[in-house]
Curated annotation (Swiss-Prot):
It comes from Campylobacter fetus subsp. fetus (strain 82-40). Its cofactor is Mg(2+). Catalyzes the initial step of the lipid cycle reactions in the biosynthesis of the cell wall peptidoglycan: transfers peptidoglycan precursor phospho-MurNAc-pentapeptide from UDP-MurNAc-pentapeptide onto the lipid carrier undecaprenyl phosphate, yielding undecaprenyl-pyrophosphoryl-MurNAc-pentapeptide, known as lipid I. NCBIfam families: mraY. It is an enzyme of class 2 (transferase). The lineage of its organism: Bacteria, Pseudomonadati, Campylobacterota, Epsilonproteobacteria, Campylobacterales. Pathway: Cell wall biogenesis; peptidoglycan biosynthesis. This is Phospho-N-acetylmuramoyl-pentapeptide-transferase. The keyword RNA-binding does not apply. The chain crosses the membrane at residues 1-21, 23-43, 66-86, 89-109, 130-150, 161-181, 193-213, 230-250, 257-277, 282-302, 331-351.
Amino acid sequence: MFYYFYELFGINFFSYITVRAGISFFLAFVLTVYFMPKFILWAKAKNANQPIYELAPQNHKKKNKIPTMGGVVFVLCAIFATLFSAKLDNNFVLIGILVLASFSLLGYIDDRGKILGAKNHAGLHAKIKFILQWIIGIICACLLLFFTDLDSLFYIPFYKYSIFDMGYFIILFWALVIISASNAVNLTDGLDGLATVPSIFGLVTLGVFAYLMGNAVYSSYLLLPKFVGVGELLILVTALIGALLGFLWFNCYPAEVFMGDSGSLSVGAFIGYMGIVTKNEILLIVIGFVFVMETLSVILQVSSFKIRKKRIFLMAPIHHHFEIKGWSENKIIVRFWMIALLANLIALIALKLR
C-alpha cells in the first residue's frame, strides 16, 4: 500500500525499500504484541496447550499448561504487514507469502490434531505430513523457476562464479532445501525462545543478502548474482523479524506461549526459501548452524541406535542432552543463541570473501 502512495501522490519517501521495510517491521511487531495476549487467553480457554512428550526431561512436565499455536498469530501479522508495505506485483514477495502461509497452515492442521480433540490425537501422520511438504515445496520451486528472474545455476559459499547449471533438477533441490529447513527449525523448537532468536539472526543475514543482490551497485561491487525484484523481499523478511520479536516478548523464559508447528514449520520453510533466492543454499548450513546441529544430533542418535543398539546422546535433539546433564534451561538457550550469532557473523563474511 505505501508504495502506491509514491505512485499516486509522488511521495518519494515511500519508494525506498528500506523505509517500507522499517514500516513492515514495526507494524508486524506492534500487531503481534497486541494480538498475542488475546490469543493466549483464547487458547487457554480452549485448552489448546502444548502436548509434552512422555519421555521428555522432567522439567518439561510443568509446560503442559502453556498454550501453543502462537505461530498462527505472528505469521498472519507478518503477512498483513507485508501486504501493507510491499509491492504486490513482485513475484518473489508473493511466493514468499505462499511459502509462509502454506507451511503455517500445514503446521496448524498438525497442531490442531494434537490438541483440539481431533480424532488423530497425534496430529498428522508423519508420512502424510512429509508428502504434503514435498507437494508444497515442489509447487513453490516451480513458481520460482518459471515466474521469477531466478536461474538454475548452483553456487557455493566464498566463490563468485556458479559451479554448474542444474536445469530442471533444481526444482527437486529447492524443494529439498525448503523441507529440510522447515523440519530443522521444527526440531529445534523445544525450549523457550530456542528456535526464535536463531531464526531472527538467520533472517537478518538473509535479508542483508537479498537487499544487496537487489541493488545493481552493491551486487556488482560484491560480485553477487543479481535478480530483478529480489530486494523487495527485504520487506517480508523484516515483517517476519518484527513478528518474531513480538512473539519473543511472550516466548522468552519462562514462556507464556509456544509457536507450535504452525510457527516452526513456516519460519523454517521461509528461511530455506530465502536461502534459495539469495543463492545461499549451501551457506544455510552456516546461517542455520544451530538448526543443523539439532537435526544432525537426531540423525546420529537414530542411526546409532539402529546400527549399534547404542545411543550417542543422553537424549536427542541435543538440547535435551544438555538438560539431562544438568544444564539450566536458560544456560542452554543463551549459549545456543551465541552459537547462532557467531555462525551468522561468519556467514556475512561470505559477502566480501568471494
